[in-house]
A protein has these predicted regions:
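Structured catalytic-domain cores with a bias toward divalent-metal coordination
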Residues: 21-307
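Bacterial N-terminal signal peptides
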Residues: 6-18
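N-terminal secretory signal peptides that target proteins for export/translocation
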Residues: 1-2
Length: 307
């Protein structure tokens, strides 16, 4: 669970920004400003248009509509990987499903499937619409993954199928439109929104993942638990702890003892890789364990239901 740092910057930690790129329309060219520019919040309609454009321009990106929202908007998910992997997506999806269900698999068969498959990596953003960075980082990350040609990005795209899902289109449309309606930039705020930024649940849409009462939750759950079964899922938020930049695994002790230890240590491995990279690049601000209030208990949110 990230805090005040987009996953685009996690990728940016991996490679310099001054790299040759394929010719793709940049966010600045499309929106008129960089993602994250002060006093600018594109709405979901504009984000959707931009994602369509990137999918048209890039053979690394396929745009899928995973369902409709409670207000009838298309909820989109970008599938990002190498062109060669796109030609074999059905096979990699099947491998991921077989490994997740583990029906009739012994250790040798599972190891063989793991060698043949690709990592399925889920990134969602925008679940809590007033945590505006979540939806914005999806767009920045999509552009970087579709345009970079450095060796590390190419390797990532060869090894990984990245699923980038917008978690709350209705909320983004409402919050961005409300914010941008004020002509005086210094008076723009998300603090006076007149209604819920998810039609029925508002901020509590992150308490729905074990019930699937909301259309948006059902759309994402179908991708997570029926279609793709990703091995890693990154559920982006933008909130405390105060004084930090990002919270990551390992989570607070004690770990949930109902889970297989390998699941917990797998989370810890991902967090250790993040922490190690930030340390090497002299980028402070990552916190974990008792430094944050996030744990592996209460398994009803988008992140924790996946456990």
């Amino acid at each position: 669970r990230a805090t005040r740092l987009c996953s685009a910057l996690v990728l940016a930690a991996a490679v310099p920004l001054t790299l040759p790129a394929q010719q793709r329309t940049s966010p600045k060219q499309f929106f008129g400003h960089d993602i994250g520019a002060d006093y600018e919040l594109p709405n979901y309609s504009k984000l959707h248009q931009y994602w369509i454009k990137i999918a048209q321009e890039s053979d690394r990106v396929v745009l899928d509509t995973i369902g409709l929202t409670e207000e009838g908007r298309p909820q989109i998910m970008a599938i990002v990987t190498s062109p060669a992997n796109h030609r074999n997506l059905a096979r990699y999806k099947d491998i991921s499903t077989r490994l997740a269900k583990a029906e009739g698999l012994d250790s040798a068969a599972a190891a063989a499937l793991a060698r043949d498959g690709k990592v399925i990596f889920w990134i969602d953003g925008g679940l809590h619409a007033t945590e505006v960075l979540g939806a914005q980082q999806l767009t920045e990350t999509l552009w970087q993954l579709s345009s970079r040609t450095d060796a590390e990005t190419v390797r990532i795209l060869d090894d990984v199928v990245i699923l980038m899902a917008h978690a709350n289109p209705d909320g983004m449309e409402l919050v961005s439109d409300w914010y941008m309606k004020e002509s005086d930039k210094l008076r723009r705020t998300t603090g006076t929104i007149p209604r819920l930024y998810e039609k029925y649940a508002g901020h509590d849409n992150n308490r729905d993942s074990y019930m699937n009462a909301l259309a948006e939750t059902r759309n994402m759950s179908a991708q997570l638990f029926i279609e793709w079964h990703p091995q890693i899922m990154y559920n982006h938020h933008q909130t405390g702890p105060t004084g930090t930049v990002m919270a990551a695994p390992p989570y607070r002790d004690p770990a949930n003892y109902w889970f297989h230890p390998a699941m917990i240590t797998g989370l810890d491995l991902v967090g250790a890789a993040l922490n190690h990279r930030f340390v090497l690049e002299h980028k402070p601000g990552l916190t974990f364990r008792q430094g944050s209030n996030y744990s592996t208990w209460w398994n009803g949110g988008l992140r924790t239901t996946g456990y």
